[in-house]
């Protein structure tokens, strides 16, 4: 279909940049090496091209082999990537490569998963590599990050079943984002879990 045009204000871009750097969001800092495995034209690579220079983080661009497991593992290891963002299929390809090759990604600390629901199995497999998985909801019209789930920091507060259920949702709205649920007539619905 036709591409959609979305206008961003300087203010929304700056606020979004600061929000993505917060600990319960993408937690980007000057200590990070970030590999955004999302195209620049897709919701601004989830804001990473703005957050990295503001934080003083190094940003590694993956080139045209964004979903190729061996290439990603090589980039992560050669560049010392600490944080990366991508859709579930990217992570499935990386994990399949790691599983079949026995290769490790020692520097990778966290991945942000968005674009579609992240399977619990992906999160659990990343756990075996010591990588924190953060589920997020992004949308072009939102500058783009809307919610982030950094539940791993609270893992010790829950039993395994409750933690598994909690970590597969998309989390809470980030700073500056307001959300509501409406019916078909745009009437706001109660926050009652139904």
Kindly give the residue locations of the regions a language model identified.
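Conserved AMP-binding A3 loop
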Residues: 1-16
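Nucleotide-sugar-dependent glycosyltransferase donor-binding/catalytic pocket residues
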Residues: 2, 42, 175
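Short beta-strand->loop structural element characteristic of the AMP-binding/adenylate-forming
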Residues: 5-7, 36, 58-65, 134
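Short aromatic/basic micro-patch
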Residues: 7, 85, 173
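Conserved AMP-binding/adenylation subdomain of ANL enzymes
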Residues: 14-33, 43-82, 97
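Short acidic capping loops at alpha-helix termini that bridge into adjacent secondary structure
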Residues: 29-33, 106-108, 169
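Gly/Ser/Thr-rich phosphate-binding loop
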Residues: 54-57, 78-86, 92-165, 178, ...
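Conserved beta-loop-beta connector loops within the AMP-binding
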Residues: 173-194
């Amino acid at each position: 279909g036709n591409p959609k045009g979305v206008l961003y204000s300087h203010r929304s871009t700056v606020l979004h940049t600061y929000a993505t750097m917060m600990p319960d969001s993408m937690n980007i800092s000057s200590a990070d090496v970030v590999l955004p495995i999302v195209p620049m034209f897709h919701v601004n690579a989830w804001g990473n091209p703005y957050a990295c220079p503001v934080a003083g983080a190094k940003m590694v661009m993956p080139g045209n082999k964004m979903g190729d497991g061996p290439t990603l593992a090589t980039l992560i290891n050669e560049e010392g990537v600490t944080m990366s963002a991508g859709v579930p299929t990217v992570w499935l390809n990386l994990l399949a490569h790691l599983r079949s090759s026995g290769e490790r990604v020692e520097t990778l600390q966290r991945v942000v998963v968005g674009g579609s629901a992240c399977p619990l199995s992906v999160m659990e497999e990343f756990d075996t590599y010591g990588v924190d998985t953060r589920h997020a909801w992004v949308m072009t019209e939102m500058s783009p990050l809307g919610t982030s789930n950094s539940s791993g920091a609270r893992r010790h507060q829950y039993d395994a079943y409750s933690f598994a259920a909690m970590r597969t949702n998309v989390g809470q709205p980030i700073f500056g984002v307001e959300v509501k649920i409406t019916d078909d007539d745009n009437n706001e619905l109660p926050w009652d879990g139904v």
